[in-house]
């Protein structure tokens, strides 16, 4: 190994940091404000303290290029909409500064609608903003588990500078002694993330109106002293057409002409530039950030084709996952680039914003010491980059201990028996195609299932969970703290389960569920019972707004030491003569909602989970279950960003589902549930899963999802959701019969089930009761119509 030294200190940059605070301080402040327990001034004071602490922590860890405007009270895309005045009329904004009431109305809706927005807490802070308005739509940020608020554009859309947040936070940092690099979402990506109610409106046609607003805020930042500004354009890693590429050239050409002395760091992440490389390199920018975790080889083409004076920001530490970097390996990769271009034209950075990882590993005191030594959270990743910079800047001796510790951690992880289980890898290697096939085709299975189950036409059921009341949450928390015994907690849960079953029988549902009161989370519940998973205490990441999630860490080979759900299913089925569904989370969803090991392909990890779930399915069938539901809520979320890579992902994802579901007899009915708003483009894969019954989210789109079935003859049974569980409103019988009649136009009566869109755990019992009583009545009326 060479000496790894250059003459000048290498800059360490972060593209963005977690906003929530080490102890979720932002969540607490937001929910207090929404509940009316604190003032706007209180909330803004907490926000300012979080920003100041963020800047201080970065500075202390050797970050020399510190971002500002990466903080948000809710979401950075919403911040951009507010900045450029893209505020739909419904929110009552008439120009001028945008109030927090308007901001949160866009994020969460107001009054009646607010309690039903996603799974957020239903609180409201009064203001003169119109009441009863819905939130903006929310969707996944690229292929992460973060959600953004979708910008809404109209044909007559105009833009104006309506918020000076980037300028205010730049000045705020400057007053504290930090000369930051402001971060803004770039104009082209911003427009591409948006939507218009008018399908004929090409959102990119709005670019000429939008760019002047960007020029105005960038000009103000430059006047305030900003030498560099970071513009995030992750759309450059997507499939783009020539018109979209031209939009980049137009926008950045105009910015450069108006602001020739402002240096722009154009940031791309979540993948490689691919066929957009030439477009990016032709832009009049001073710097380009590359994701070298997802696409390490693109650096060669950038160096070969790019301008020699282009500053390269090397995203070499994974901003999406929690694994510690192998620093000696990174040194070997980065040193030739630094020596070739010079230290002044290279920055070291995470692959993307650190928003997607927890704040501080040091808060974890209960993790296995070996596992902890393999991990790195946001603050640790900054330290890794500083160590790398030190080693490359002639300070090798000073960082030798850190380099040695990194090498040791990588070596122990590669060899650890905690990670590698020969029995699991041998079993995975022995999987055959026959194990992913049911014994008979659907038609033969359906005949046997109908004979066995004797269900009416249009059978009614729910998706799985029932309301998790405050009493249930309190009991769970008390049990976790040891305040109530296992036996007492179990008795309490059995009582809740029995009540839910009696209630379902009284309402008249045909197929019952046990309610899942014993489950904290649909992934964590299983991960805690599988080998190869670990859980943090403070490993929170933002999902949206105040909602934070604590993803499981999938660190090793996965197996199932003992049955996970059979005891609860047996107890529930003993209380009723009606069919009781076994309820499981599918392997693809468990994978996609976890921090996944990076030492094997994702498909390998998923196959291992599928084998564990297959064992559980077999045990449920052995115990007498006639129906087993395997939820794959996150199947679509795992789709790669580039369409050319979809087939590879869907092939192994479908194979894993079939592996876990195909070991049963023909007369055992396999259900699955998917909750997302479009699947027309993956209908082949959904059919290939070969579930006997699939339930899907369709009510909000008024059954538009079923348009796929006009041309595609879906063979199996399907339960299109007939009411939206995300809203507290109780739908009428007529609304649900109307939706069922729409479904009957696309599918045969024999295929249709009747169910809500999704699980009911976030709703109240009063809402659920009214809705399900009406749903059962709607099914009864449709049976009469069908019978003619």
Swiss-Prot record:
Swiss-Prot/TrEMBL GO biological process terms = methionine biosynthetic process; methylation
- Residue positions annotated to bind Zn(2+) are 673, 675, 697, 758
User: Keyword Transferase on this protein?
Assistant: yes
Q: Where does L-methionine bind?
A: 463-465, 516, 631
Chain sites annotated for binding 5-methyltetrahydropteroyltri-L-glutamate: 24-27, 140, 547-548, 593, 637
> HAMAP family, from UniProt?
Meth_synth (MF_00172)
> What role is this protein assigned?
Catalyzes the transfer of a methyl group from 5-methyltetrahydrofolate to homocysteine resulting in methionine formation.
What is the protein name stated in its UniProt record?
5-methyltetrahydropteroyltriglutamate--homocysteine methyltransferase
Query: What is the organism of origin for this protein?
Result: Rhodopseudomonas palustris (strain TIE-1)
Provide the taxonomic classification: Bacteria, Pseudomonadati, Pseudomonadota, Alphaproteobacteria, Hyphomicrobiales
Q: What is this protein's gene name?
A: metE
């Amino acid at each position: 190994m060479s000496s790894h030294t250059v003459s000048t200190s290498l800059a360490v940059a972060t593209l963005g940091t977690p906003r929530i605070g080490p102890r979720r301080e932002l969540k607490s402040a937001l929910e207090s404000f929404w509940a009316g327990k604190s003032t706007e001034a209180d909330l803004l004071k907490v926000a300012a303290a979080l920003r100041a602490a963020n800047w201080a922590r970065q500075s202390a860890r050797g970050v020399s290029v510190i971002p500002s405007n990466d903080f948000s009270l809710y979401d950075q895309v919403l911040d951009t909409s507010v900045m450029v005045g893209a505020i739909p009329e419904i929110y009552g904004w008439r120009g001028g500064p945008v109030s927090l009431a308007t901001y949160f109305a866009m994020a969460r809706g107001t009054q009646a609608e607010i309690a039903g927005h996603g799974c957020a807490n239903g609180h409201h802070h009064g203001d003169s903003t119109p009441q009863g308005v819905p939130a903006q739509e929310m969707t996944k940020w690229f292929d992460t588990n973060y959600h953004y608020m979708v910008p809404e554009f109209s044909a007559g859309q105009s833009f104006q500078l309506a918020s000076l947040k980037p300028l205010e936070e730049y000045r705020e940092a400057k007053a504290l002694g930090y000369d930051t690099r402001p971060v803004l979402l770039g104009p082209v990506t911003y427009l591409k993330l948006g939507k218009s109610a008018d399908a004929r409106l090409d959102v990119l046609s709005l670019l000429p109106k939008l760019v002047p607003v960007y020029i105005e805020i960038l000009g103000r930042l430059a006047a305030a002293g900003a030498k560099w500004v970071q513009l995030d354009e992750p759309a450059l890693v997507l499939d783009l057409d020539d018109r979209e590429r031209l939009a980049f050239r137009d926008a950045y050409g105009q910015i450069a002409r108006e602001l020739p002395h402002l240096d722009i760091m154009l940031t791309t992440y979540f993948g490689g530039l691919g066929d957009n490389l030439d477009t990016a390199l032709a832009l009049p920018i001073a710097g380009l950030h590359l994701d070298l975790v997802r696409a390490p080889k693109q650096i060669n083409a950038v160096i070969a084709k790019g301008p020699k004076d282009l500053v390269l920001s090397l995203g070499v530490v994974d901003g999406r996952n929690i694994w510690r970097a192998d620093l000696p390996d990174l040194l070997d990769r980065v040193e030739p680039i630094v020596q070739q271009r010079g230290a002044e034209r290279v920055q070291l950075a995470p692959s993307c914003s650190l928003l997607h990882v927890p704040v501080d590993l040091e808060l974890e005191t209960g993790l296995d010491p070996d596992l902890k030594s393999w991990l790195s959270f946001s603050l640790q990743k900054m330290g890794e980059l500083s160590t790398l910079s030190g080693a490359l800047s002639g300070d090798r001796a000073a960082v030798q201990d850190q380099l040695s510790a990194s090498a040791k951690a990588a070596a122990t992880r590669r060899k650890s028996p905690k990670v590698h289980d020969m029995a699991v890898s041998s079993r995975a290697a022995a999987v055959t195609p026959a194990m992913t096939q049911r014994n008979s085709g659907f038609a033969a299975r359906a005949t046997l299932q109908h004979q066995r189950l004797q269900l009416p036409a249009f059978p009614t059921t729910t998706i799985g969970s029932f309301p998790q009341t405050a009493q249930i949450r309190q009991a769970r928390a008390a049990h976790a703290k040891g305040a109530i015994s296992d036996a007492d907690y179990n008795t309490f849960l059995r009582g809740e389960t029995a009540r839910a079953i009696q209630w379902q029988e009284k309402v008249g549902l045909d197929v019952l569920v046990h309610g899942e009161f014993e489950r904290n989370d649909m992934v964590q519940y299983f991960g805690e019972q599988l080998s190869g998973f670990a859980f943090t205490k403070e490993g929170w990441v933002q999902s949206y707004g105040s909602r934070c999630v604590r993803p499981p860490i999938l660190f090793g080979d996965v197996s199932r030491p003992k049955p996970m759900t059979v005891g609860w299913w047996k107890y529930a089925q003993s209380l009723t003569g009606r069919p009781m569904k076994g309820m499981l989370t599918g392997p693809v969803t468990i994978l996609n909602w976890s921090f996944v090991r990076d030492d094997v392909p994702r498909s390998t990890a998923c196959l291992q989970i599928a084998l564990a779930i297959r064992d559980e399915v077999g045990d449920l069938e052995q115990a007498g279950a006639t129906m087993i539901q395997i939820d794959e809520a996150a199947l679509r979320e795992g789709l790669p960003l580039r369409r050319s890579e979809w087939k590879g992902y869907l092939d192994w994802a479908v194979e894993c589902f079939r592996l876990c579901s195909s070991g049963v007899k023909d007369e055992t009915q396999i259900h699955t549930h998917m909750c997302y708003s479009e699947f027309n483009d993956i209908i082949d894969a959904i059919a290939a899963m070969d579930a006997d019954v699939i339930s899907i989210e369709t009510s909000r789109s008024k059954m538009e999802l079923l348009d796929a079935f006009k041309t595609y003859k879906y063979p199996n049974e399907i339960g299109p959701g007939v009411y939206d569980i995300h809203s507290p409103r109780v739908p009428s019988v007529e609304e649900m019969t109307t939706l069922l009649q729409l479904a009957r136009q696309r599918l045969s009566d024999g295929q249709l089930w009747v169910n809500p869109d999704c699980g009911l755990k976030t709703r109240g019992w009063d809402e659920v009761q009214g809705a399900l009583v009406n749903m059962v009545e709607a099914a009864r009326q449709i049976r009469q119509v069908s019978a003619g």
